[in-house]
Curated annotation (Swiss-Prot):
Domain (TRAM) ranges: 387-454
Gene3D superfamilies named in the record: Methylthiotransferase, N-terminal domain (3.40.50.12160), tm_1862 like domain (3.80.30.20)
Recorded family membership: Belongs to the methylthiotransferase family. MiaB subfamily.
Name of this chain's protein: tRNA-2-methylthio-N(6)-dimethylallyladenosine synthase
Residue ranges annotated for the MTTase N-terminal domain, each copy included: 5-125
Taxonomic superkingdom: Bacteria
A Pfam family matched in the record: Radical_SAM
Cofactor remark: Binds 2 [4Fe-4S] clusters. One cluster is coordinated with 3 cysteines and an exchangeable S-adenosyl-L-methionine.
Compartments it resides in: Cytoplasm
Catalytic activity, EC: 2.8.4.3
Keywords: 4Fe-4S, Cytoplasm, Iron, Iron-sulfur, Metal-binding, S-adenosyl-L-methionine, Transferase, tRNA processing
UniProt enzyme class: transferase
Residues in Radical SAM core domain copies: 152-384
Amino acid sequence: MAPPRKLHIKSYGCQMNVYDAQRMVDVLAPEGFVETASVDDADLVILNTCHIREKASEKVFSELGRLRLARDEASRDGRRMQIVVAGCVAQAEGDEIVRRQPAVDVVVGPQSYHHLPRLLAQAAQTGRALETEFPIADKFGFLPQPQPEAIRARGISAFVTVQEGCDKFCTFCVVPYTRGAEVSRPVAAILADVERLADHGVRELTLIGQNVNAYHGDGPDGRPWTLGRLLQRLAAVPGIVRLRYSTSHPNDVDDDLIAAHRDLDALMPFVHLPVQSGSDRILAAMNRKHTAADYRRVIDRFRAVRPEIAFSSDFIVGFPGETDADFEATLALVTQIGYAGAYSFKYSPRPGTPAAEMPEMVPAAVMDERLERLQQVIDAQQSAFNRAAIGRTVDVLFERAGRKPGQIVGRTAYLQPAHVFPPAGMAPDSLVGQILPVRVDSLERYSLLGELAATPPRHARPLAATGA
């Protein structure tokens, strides 16, 4: 029997890329590949790229330069290393990658990685393989199921893609061009995946999609199901104790999703709901198709049915034409909502997007100053939210042993890491997969520290009360 070939994947960007990287491993496992943490002994290296941030492609080319040296070293040792560029940079700039970096064997877009075995064989024969077309048939029907040992090795939490692509065409965003139009998987296919994951130890699911709450997959009744209805069904799968979803668009929050948050204890009271700006003028320029007031009303709908719910968001500062008044409107919105955390970025033009051609680019120094001010407010809110847990008892789903001997690590409903030393005689590994009450004693940066409690947890105070 031939020895296994070693595969190293370096993944950038979003949760979808994390999921895609795992599925690439599943695709290549029948071909005899096993994962390795090191590039140096890899027979195959895959860069699973992201195109969202500025200079994404240049970072890829820089990494490819380093990989070319590793490939040369492998060749001197008598080994052949193949190099693959996958993901959204591959989709957007495949021809440029082929032109600039001859060391690359395969360039494959995010809708075609189920063809990796064929593409690798083609590259071995002809020297190069490129596939970045959007296929007629979606890839999910062709992906092999992960092996039980792979599921267990990935832990008790898992991502499941239910929707892919986006039809919103925000003027700053490349996703519609790199991931394509919105496609939703059938309910039956998702349910089969989830039941298999649960059978092999998964306890927490995060349903993912570029615009996940636009989900409209075919249901067993022959009608399209909403995300809320899908969540209701998945909450009934034995073994699944927590459900999450990401990333959402405010315009696609419907009655079914609100009802799911009202009715399902398994659906965590923590929602990532990007808004990008608090200025109606900038929101219109971004083609977001909602106002700041619309966004606040969506937040209010969630809080009306789940008072303990918390939110995170995304913000862009320095969008073309953003004035001081526009930025102050963003600060005002952040203060009004009160977030458990948020991600803030300086605007970076993405080639091929409408915003990249807009006039009135904001000076870099102004963007830097605005980003710092916004991040200070966000950090203060996150600190206040975390401090509010001190002295309280919260539910923690334990995931793995901690870095310190005898320590166990899990996460709260709000994704806060929680570090606990179980009582003497209780093995930390025995707690993995269990939800147990933890009394929070203190904080360490963004983590909660505490001890197992005998009393059941209380609901956290609604986040609106902790806004900075």
